[in-house]
């Protein structure tokens, strides 16, 4: 608004912004004004004022799109007079306050975005975690890994060394190949048990080396890799009942 803009003109601009907001949200609603002058301007059949014409066009557009925009005066005359006095004081302020409202779905979406941003920040601080290498971005979409593939990627699951580390089972934690502790990395890339070697060979032929896996897991288009990873995990991750007691 230009300096010296009248109260009625300022109120009409506020009403125009309210109409634009309702149309953009495709939502019916009430716009309440304290200015009798603004209501009087809108009641005139013809008006050369651009803002008044834009408000009427917005109301007509809303009718065509089944969006009901209603503009009315607030309360008794004494309240209007008080509002006019407040408006005169506000006219001299360097900025204009505009208050908008969100529906429940928009509030939930904004809250979700805020939480994801917070989780991403925390996740980014933990880049020593093995799963962080494959999944650097926090999202609310499941990547498609099955139960055993999740264990393989995170390192938490049906592995003897994992059970021994947290004292969940007694035993040495040694892999059935006898060469090292049974961890996710060992099972995935080092174990010499024949069926695991065969599954690893098929996986490597389809996907690539360990470095290739880390790179491709970070790509947007990774459906084939996820499928191959699920297949590999089913072949090399043992069931809980098969672990030593």
From Swiss-Prot:
InterPro entries reported in the protein's UniProt record: RNaseH-like_sf, RNaseH_sf
Residue ranges of the region described as Nucleic acid-binding endonuclease: 106-245
UniProt KW Hydrolase keyword: yes
Molecular functions per Gene Ontology: endonuclease activity; nucleic acid binding; RNA-directed DNA polymerase activity
Keyword Nuclease: yes
Its EC number(s): 2.7.7.49
Keywords per UniProt: Endonuclease, Hydrolase, Nuclease, Nucleotidyltransferase, RNA-directed DNA polymerase, Transferase, Transposable element
Enzymatic class: transferase
Reaction equation(s) it catalyzes: DNA(n) + a 2'-deoxyribonucleoside 5'-triphosphate = DNA(n+1) + diphosphate
Residues of the Reverse transcriptase domain: 1-105
Name recorded for this polypeptide: Retrovirus-related Pol polyprotein from type-1 retrotransposable element R1
């Amino acid at each position: 608004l230009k300096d010296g803009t009248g109260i009625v003109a300022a109120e009409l601009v506020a009403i125009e912004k309210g109409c634009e907001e309702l149309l953009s949200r495709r939502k019916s609603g009430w716009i309440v004004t304290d200015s009798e002058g603004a209501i009087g301007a809108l009641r005139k059949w013809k008006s050369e004022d651009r803002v008044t014409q834009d408000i009427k066009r917005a109301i007509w557009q809303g009718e065509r799109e089944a969006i009901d925009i209603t503009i009315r005066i607030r309360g008794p005359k004494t309240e209007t007079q008080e509002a006019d006095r407040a408006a005169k004081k506000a006219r001299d302020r360097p900025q204009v306050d505009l208050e908008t409202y969100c529906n429940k779905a928009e509030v939930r979406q904004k809250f979700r975005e805020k939480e994801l941003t917070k989780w991403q920040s925390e996740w980014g601080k933990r880049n020593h975690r093995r799963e962080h290498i494959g999944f650097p971005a926090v999202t609310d979409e499941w990547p498609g890994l099955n139960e055993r593939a999740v264990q393989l990627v995170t390192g938490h699951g049906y592995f003897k060394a994992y059970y021994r580390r947290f004292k969940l089972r007694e035993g040495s934690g040694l892999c059935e190949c006898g060469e090292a502790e049974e961890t996710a990395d060992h099972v995935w890339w080092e174990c010499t048990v024949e069926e695991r070697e065969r599954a690893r060979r098929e996986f490597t032929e389809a996907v690539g080396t360990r470095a290739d896996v880390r790179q491709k897991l970070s790509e947007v288009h990774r459906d084939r890799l996820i499928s191959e990873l699920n297949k590999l995990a089913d072949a090399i991750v043992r069931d809980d009942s098969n672990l030593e007691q």
